[in-house]
């Protein structure tokens, strides 16, 4: 049975009782940079980790966010969540990752600490960058 877990340096794998490390591929590095960009509210990190055909789907937005509009969306997101009491401290849990056919797909439950804001996210990354994210909100 093969188990994988994302980490800051690579992903771990285990087959039977043997454990090892494999260097991260570009898509793992880009996914890590993308989430760091959100944690740090760093537009440069976000843009540099996305592909040219990037699309972000947030049901609170009137239309999908593309790569060019991502920095403005990040500012709107920060203002909107701070009005709810958030300080951009995230709690991600129940993460599931799949690396298949050159696409890293990551699902997680997210919560903004200090608020009732929570939901699910799916993020898809290729070796040219994060190309898709969709978030949902739950009450």
Could you say what each language-model-derived stretch is?
Residues 32-36, 48-63:
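Short, solvent-exposed secondary-structure junction/capping segments
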Residues 38, 42, 54, 78-81:
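Short amphipathic alpha-helical segments enriched in hydrophobics
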Residues 23-42, 49, 73:
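Short, aromatic-enriched amphipathic alpha-helices that serve as compact interaction elements
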